[in-house]
Amino acid sequence: LNKNGSNILDLKSPLIEKAIFKSCSIKKKVVEADEKEMGMRKILNFGHTFAHAYEATLGYSKKLNHGEAVLLGLKTAAKFSLLNKILNIKEFKLIENHLDELNLPRDINKFFSIKNEKKILSFMKKDKKNNTKKINLVLLKKISFPIYKLQFNEKKIHLFLKKELNK
C-alpha cells in the first residue's frame, strides 16, 4: 500500500483488482480459520467499534457512509493504540499517511464535537463485541499485527474521546 497506494486509488489501474483480490484472500483465510468468531477473526473488527458508534451517533445519515465511518474508526483506533503505547509513532504515521492519501473524510471533528462524546461512548458500550462492563477494542501492535483481547474501562475511552473531540 505504501508503494502503490495512490495507483490503487485510480480505479482504472490493474492494481485495484490485485488489491481487492489480496484483501478478500486475507479475509477468507481469517474467516475460515475462525468461522464462529471465537478468536482470531475478531481482528477484522479493527476500527469498527468506533466506526459503528460514529454511524449510530449520526443516525445512520448520509453525512457519513459506512466506508467513511470505518476509515474514521481505523484512524481513531490507530491513534488510541498509539496513545496507549501499543503502537509506535513510526507505524502510526504510516497508517495516518496512507489513510490521508485516500482523500476521504478523515477528521472526526468535521462530524462531531465534544457535545457528541457521551453519545459516541454510549454506542460503544452497546457494541455486540462487549461481554463485560468494559469496552472491547481491536488495536494494533504494528501494521498487520492486531491485538483483539483488549478491554478498556469507560473512563479511559471517555478521556480519549474528550481530547480528540476538543481540537
List the predicted regions and their residue ranges.
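Catalytic Zn2+-binding segment of zinc metalloproteases
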Residues: 53-62
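Small-residue-rich helix-loop
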Residues: 67-76
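C-terminal charged capping/lid subdomain of soluble metabolic enzymes
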Residues: 86-167
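Active-site His/Glu-centered metal-binding helix of metallohydrolases
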Residues: 46, 50-54
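Carboxylate- and glycine-rich phosphate/diphosphate-binding segment that chelates Mg2+/Mn2+
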Residues: 1-44
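Short glycine/serine- and small hydrophobic-enriched flexible loop segments
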Residues: 56, 75-83
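Flexible, glycine/charged-enriched surface loops at secondary-structure junctions
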Residues: 15, 35-43, 64-67, 87-92, ...
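Alpha-helical transmembrane segments of multipass membrane proteins
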Residues: 26-30, 53, 80
